[in-house]
Structures are given as structure tokens and as C-alpha cells.
Amino acid sequence: GVNKEEAHIRWVMAEQGAGTYTAESLNQLSLLETCAAAAGRTGVRVLVRLTSGNQFGMDEEDILASIRNRGCYPHLDLAGLQYYSGTQKRGMEKIKKELEKLDSFLDFVREHMNFEFRELEYGPGFQIPYFEGQEQTDEETLLQEFKKILDSLNFKGIIFLEAGRFLAAPCGSYLTRVADAKRCQGQNYCIVDGGINHVNYYGQTMAMK
């Protein structure tokens, strides 16, 4: 997660429980280094997260600083770059622009920092239809178009996809109990005994059956 507690990281490293860690800040890199040294671990794989302009991840300057000062992290392996800007993206244009931006940054790192990330973890944020009547995604066409974009990149390392909603959304149903029903100003409402945290995102209501 975004918040990493030292005690938790120490426990995970002691149990050999994580193959790869993400770092959201330079402070987290230092924390991972401290915990790895204490656990006697070397080559701990880390993905540094590049921000998309929000509270998550690091800006380009901090990532370049982590590469420049990688000697300060002798127990860590800066294996790759991680990037995720959000979900429910309509069309492929934003995804294409994001990947072109990432490719340009990776080119800069390789050419000017004498360093090359081996991996890129990218969350495309493919859109999933939640409401009745919404157009269903043609997955084959979508993925073929996405593949063409990936094939055009200069980056030739390993690319991992973070596609949680795209994979998980069709795989289950949300069941809850109607506790009360009412009508207010011509609108029908049901009061249910379930939460709403999983049906709201970025101010949008996501309908669930």
C-alpha cells in the first residue's frame, strides 16, 4: 500500500513474504534500505512509482535522484518503474499519451543517467461498463490496439500490467439486503445493509447488481 510501516516491512522481510516492493517517496526508499539491512537481505527488488500529478508516487526529479544516489541503497535493486493514473479511461488516446510519456522518460534515464530500468509496471485503467445499457467493451479489439502501442515503445524490458478492475469486475456479484424502501420527491430509494466504498470512485457512482 501507499503507507508503509517499518514494523510491517521488517516482519514481511523476515518472513521472506514479498518479492517486490514499491516506493512512493525517497523516504520509503530509505526505509526499505534500513529494513533490508536489518534483515540481512540483499537485492531486494523495488519499483519506484512515478506520480501522475496526484498524491501518489514521486516526481521525475526524485526518481532521478534515487538513481543518482543508488549507492545509498546497497541492499536494494531498483528494478523498475511503476505508473498508474486511475481507472475507467474512455478510449485509447490517454493511454497512448501516458505510455509515450513513460517511454520518453525511460529513454532519458537510459541516455543521460547511464542506468536502465528492466521492468515497467503500468496500470492502463481500461473502462468497464457498470450501468445497464452501457456499451460492452470489445476486449479483443481493445487488447489488439493496446498491443500495437506497446510494440511501438522504445522500452524493451519486461512490462507488467496492473489491470485489477478490468479482470475482476466481471468475476462476481455484490449481494446485499434491502433494509428499507421509500419514495422521496418522486424518486425511489432502497436502504441496504452494505457499504458504498466499492461502488464509488473519483466522485462517480458505479452501479452494482
How would you name each of these model-derived features?
Residues 85-87, 120-127, 163-166:
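Glycine-rich beta-strand-to-loop/alpha-helix junction loops that act as flexible
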